[in-house]
């Protein structure tokens, strides 16, 4: 089976709505072992939608559409799918009863145009939609071709696909694709590719690196007759990759760096406080995203001025005069000072020049010092980021969290 994912809606073409449906469907179809070779977007125009059906069926046997099932005149998906397969539309009385019940239960007024959502070909396989007013449908044409019609809103589309389309499609495939994602930080995509370059030509499982935001992901994908067989193919490849990348791998799947660090802090009962200058509270804010962090996060201070650094953190005036606020010495005193004043086992500091102004030949834009004080032992790292202001701040925050992760993993 080969499929094309087709989003229908002018609002997507214009960029008013981000098409997250395509990402969801692509992943789910891959898990079923169904190849997706094309994705397309077409506006609310009859001629262009029919043309899109024609073009899609030149390369696939299954089209999965999202959108265009609403009650308005420009919702055309099912009418045009029916026309394409020479099927006649008719009122499905059972759908009308369900729709009337939906409006009554939600104390809403049902207008005449809502009945449009109850018209389908009599041959259509109806896909119930308990989360909205627009049912989906599967239309099966000649030569093993089919169009699967799904609503546009993700909260309606995703459960409909999972509960009804997956069982339907499973009948047409005898294999599954299983992927495992390893999340990497501390080495760039090119460096990581060098470390695993000989593995990238492997066919089953396949190995593919992707840069995503600031971290990098490595996807291992295997095809098997079932999930268990595919996972057995992945296991030795994962073991080899972990051997090569070591602690640069911080997690699996959709886990974030902040979740990994937050869990380590809570599990190890390591209290923490932050003193930030150039990051302006980003480290504290990111840590606070983790549920339960209140058990260990005590305090976050944004000490932007020299006066605040001296008054709040105890940074010495001589340190600022001799070395400046952006210096190893200042970062060290900031980390020690916040840990002492907040009474925490860990103190984190950041100080740097985020730009666009303020840089010198000796201290250019992108120069950052970060301090990490753990149980009285303080270390400082120096970073040089060549990026705009926001990226300098974000990269500082991510590198500090990754540094903290590595240090926490050493603690029993």
Swiss-Prot record:
Entry-linked CDD domains: cinA
TM spans (from-to): none
InterPro entries: CinA, CinA-like_C, CinA_C, CinA_KH, Competence-induced_CinA, MoaB/Mog-like_dom_sf, MoaB/Mog_dom
Pfam families registered for this protein in UniProt: CinA, CinA_KH, MoCF_biosynth
HAMAP family the UniProt entry points to: CinA_B
UniProt family annotation: Belongs to the CinA family.
Name this protein carries in UniProt: Putative competence-damage inducible protein
Protein species of origin: Clostridium perfringens (strain 13 / Type A)
Gene: cinA
